């Protein structure tokens, strides 16, 4: 009875962990999709520079190929574990444990590799200044994608230019910065700010923001936290799965063993009784014959006398 209660408890815990796997995997996929626009625009601004290489080394090994594949596979594995737990199927639970172990090893290797790559990111502050060369094509009809990337980055990171907002005046033929540099953006806001109050423009350059972006953003920190949480949850799930496999295996093994032992005990205990019962009629018959012989001899002796 105690073992049956333990099995129920283990199954409930595995149900909860599988649900947690699904939720965290969906969260990782959502955050990865959320970061996609950031990465695309940053790569557009940093094309053919050392900054582009740093962005790729920092984000893409984690965000695109590995984390997305692991999370998609983990959703399927969670379904496998759920079915195995419901049906108490040893084979499905064994596959579930093996899949979790493989996923955990991949995540661990990816984490170590990413950490080493972050240490080796070959970018310096001086590399950010080279981004000024990308500003000359801003606003041109055939470079709309670059214009969109600059506007997106300046709005999202609340910055203007590379070092300072005056970079737009130096590197382009513009008389004032783009409207995306305004703290409160509206059509013509940058012209008004340039003529009246420069404090209405973002004072910090985008070079520092991009440098901070390479060192880690909130989205990347969320991904790391989710990755660590998934790893810890996988360890707990593997421990519970091994325990459940052990309990189910011995629950299936012990009834057969008990029946064999009971049959053996019954055989050893009941055979003497059957033998005694079989011997009882023979003994009674011998006693009757002996009694009849004794009475006959007594009667014969009395007649002789």
Curated annotation (Swiss-Prot):
Q: At the top level of its lineage, which domain of life is listed?
A: Eukaryota
The chain's Cytoplasmic topological domains, given as residue ranges, are 1-12, 81-89, 246-305
Biological processes annotated in GO: angiogenesis; cell surface receptor signaling pathway; regulation of angiogenesis; retina layer formation
* UniProt xrefs under InterPro entries: Tetraspanin/Peripherin, Tetraspanin_animals, Tetraspanin_CS, Tetraspanin_EC2_sf
Q: Where in the cell is it found?
A: Cell membrane
Extracellular side, ranges: 34-59, 111-224
**What does the UniProt PTM comment say about this protein?**
Palmitoylated; required for interaction with ADAM10. The precise position of palmitoylated residues is unclear and occurs either on Cys-9, Cys-12 and/or Cys-83.
Q: Give the record's keywords alphabetically.
A: Angiogenesis, Cell membrane, Lipoprotein, Membrane, Palmitate, Transmembrane, Transmembrane helix
Q: Which PROSITE patterns match?
A: TM4_1 (PS00421)
Which cellular component, as a GO term, is one annotated location?
Answer: plasma membrane
Record's bilayer topology term: Multi-pass membrane protein
- Chain residues carrying a lipid of type S-palmitoyl cysteine: 9, 12, 83
Q: How does it assemble?
A: Component of a complex, at least composed of TSPAN12, FZD4 and norrin (NDP). Interacts (when palmitoylated) with ADAM10. Interacts with MMP14/MT1-MMP.
Please give the function described in this protein's UniProt entry: Regulator of cell surface receptor signal transduction. Plays a central role in retinal vascularization by regulating norrin (NDP) signal transduction. Acts in concert with norrin (NDP) to promote FZD4 multimerization and subsequent activation of FZD4, leading to promote accumulation of beta-catenin (CTNNB1) and stimulate LEF/TCF-mediated transcriptional programs.
| Family (UniProt) | Belongs to the tetraspanin (TM4SF) family.
Report the protein name in the record: Tetraspanin-12
The protein's organism comes out as: Bos taurus (Bovine)
The gene is: TSPAN12
